[in-house]
A protein has these predicted regions:
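N-terminal glycine-rich FAD/FM-binding segment characteristic of electron-transfer flavoproteins
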Residues: 24-280
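Short, Lys/Arg-enriched N-terminal segments with co-localized hydrophobic residues
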Residues: 10-27
Length: 280
């Protein structure tokens, strides 16, 4: 399978716009693309110009992917179908899949790529697009961007590679059985975009928060099998790396705060808040 570099193109949506797609039957299979990133509360260490992954204390879902997963679960509950959770990366990413299974994902797919941090965005998109096609899904949910890179290219890139319609900045998706309607922000408030499969939805923060697993869900997730696919299994040529990151650098540390005690310091505190912090 040879997947080519996606063509960059702009899509402008208007209220009640219908984008034609190709239907693949009544059974709905939703592929949810998930990325494991350092938790927003985890301390990041940089050694030799690279993030030290061994020092990351906690890994979690990329936040926008949580909205995509929860929206897929709600669509499954209202319209039926099944959810295939797909992630690409090293072995530690399997925990992410089990977390997805604990809240309702039906099939778990781990695309094994220990060196995925050496891939550029297009290589990752080629990998994910091949996994989506192998899964048989005609509908794809993902976050609008990853919390670690903020690239925002996965949704449009995968859509281009699999020949699907793409709607970005989505907050909600519904289905009437014959197509899908996505809600997204507009200059006038909100707009509804109607599409048919195959289609890709890239989610912004929506009206729903990620549900928490119950004990039964957690126990069942531990037993659920994970399908592991290699790059060779997918039969895809991901191409050469076209973008190399020279180095990472942490932000400058904030200066230590100042502490004041006693009534005699009130005038000093007020002066600093007014003249330095500009908050009063």
């Amino acid at each position: 399978m040879n997947l080519q570099t996606p063509t960059v193109r702009s899509l402008i949506f208007i209220d009640e716009l219908m984008v034609e797609g190709t239907s693949k039957g009544n059974h709905m299979t939703i592929a949810v693309l998930l990325k494991q990133v350092p938790d927003t509360t985890a301390k990041i260490s940089v050694i030799g110009g690279r993030v030290d992954e061994n020092a990351v204390s906690k890994w979690s879902f990329s936040p926008y992917d949580e909205y995509a997963l929860e929206s897929a679960l709600q669509l499954k509950e209202s319209a039926g179908g099944e959810i295939v959770a797909i992630t690409a990366g090293p072995a530690r990413c399997e925990k992410l899949l089990r977390d997805a299974a604990a809240v309702g994902a039906d099939t778990l797919v781990h695309v094994s790529a220990e060196n995925i941090n050496d891939f550029d965005s297009i290589q990752v998109q080629n990998l994910l697009a091949a996994a989506v096609q192998k899964s048989g899904a005609s509908v794809v949910f993902c976050g609008k961007q990853a919390a670690d890179t903020n690239a925002g290219s996965t949704g449009p890139g995968v859509a281009e590679l699999i020949g699907a319609s793409c709607v970005t900045l989505v907050s909600e998706v519904s289905s009437d059985g014959g197509g899908y309607t996505a809600t997204r922000p507009s200059s006038a408030g909100h707009e509804k975009v109607a599409v048919s499969a195959p289609c890709v939805f890239a989610f912004d923060k929506g009206i729903c928060e990620m549900r928490r697993p119950n004990v039964r869900g957690i126990m069942m997730a531990k037993k659920k099998p994970i399908e592991t696919w290699s790059v060779e299994d997918l039969g895809v040529d991901i191409g050469a790396n076209g973008v190399n990151i020279d180095s990472h650098s942490p932000p400058a540390e904030k200066p230590p705060g100042q502490k004041f005690e006693g009534a005699d310091s009130v005038s000093t505190v007020v002066s600093k808040l007014r003249d330095e912090a500009n908050v009063i």
